[in-house]
Amino acid sequence: MDLWVAIQALILGVVEGITEFLPVSSTGHQIIVADLIGFGGERALAFNIIIQLGAILAVIWEYRRKIIDVVVGLPEERQAQKFTVNLLIAFMPAVVLGVAFADLIHEYLFNPITVAAALVIGGIVMLWAERRDHAIRAETVDDMTWTLALKVGFAQCLALVPGTSRSGSTIIGGLLFGLSRKAATEFSFFLAMPTMVGAAVYSGYKYRDLFQPGDFAVFAIGFVTSFIFAMLAVRALLKFIGNHSYAAFAWYRIGFGLLILATWQLGMIDWSTAIG
């Protein structure tokens, strides 16, 4: 492994870690940055699986106490049982629709116009969700009912559309359905755990032939970097929403969507190859 490859792995690990749990589309950022630094090919596909796994393990580690409490209390504690049921209910819609329509979505929606439109529309909806008057129905994730969990689960299905952002769809959905900012954000984190681990395992098996022993060092750099920066991003986001709305992220989504359209129209990035 030469120095430049190590730097590429470091850069992409940072990008994944920072953007995965922010409502801004980590995939879009990965595509642009990977193109700018010349990181592509089959190695890149396997590498992306590894760094996504690093990011999700970071949030699992960050919430390890909550997870342990739920697991230990599951046999007898009603709150632990309720939380687990809510998580499973929210998890299932994306699994069913993802398995049923994944190939069609990849064939017809993986293009720059879809990605840009999803970013812009998501940003506009996020602004509306933040500015409208609505009653808070759940201050914390423990206050959520199964119906609220199901609604957020259906909102997560929107993330099947490229550019929507998994965290963006669940956070926006949570806000629209009456969750507080903290509850919407934390439930998005918890819902990411089974969703992303499942996706990583599925993709890892599907593309298992792409994992080569010679790439171990590159993968290790990306994994560790993604883990560290995802943990920092999660902590920073929770602190940020304590005193701020999601409006800044909404405007960022809109600007990023327009940037994607510009890079595509001007031929600066070959998006057809990147996401086709």
UniProtKB/Swiss-Prot annotation:
Pfam families assigned to the protein according to its UniProt record, in alphabetical order: BacA
Span of the signal peptide: none
Transmembrane segments: 44-63, 85-105, 109-129, 183-203, 214-234, 249-269
Entry membrane topology: Multi-pass membrane protein
Catalytically driven reaction(s): di-trans,octa-cis-undecaprenyl diphosphate + H2O = di-trans,octa-cis-undecaprenyl phosphate + phosphate + H(+)
An annotated GO BP: peptidoglycan biosynthetic process
GO molecular function: undecaprenyl-diphosphatase activity
Subcellular location: Cell inner membrane
GO cellular component: plasma membrane
EC number: 3.6.1.27
Keywords, in A-Z order: Antibiotic resistance, Cell inner membrane, Cell membrane, Cell shape, Cell wall biogenesis/degradation, Hydrolase, Membrane, Peptidoglycan synthesis, Transmembrane, Transmembrane helix
Function: Catalyzes the dephosphorylation of undecaprenyl diphosphate (UPP). Confers resistance to bacitracin.
Family: Belongs to the UppP family.
Leftover remarks: Bacitracin is thought to be involved in the inhibition of peptidoglycan synthesis by sequestering undecaprenyl diphosphate, thereby reducing the pool of lipid carrier available.
Protein name, UniProt field: Undecaprenyl-diphosphatase 1
Source species of the chain: Stutzerimonas stutzeri (strain A1501) (Pseudomonas stutzeri)
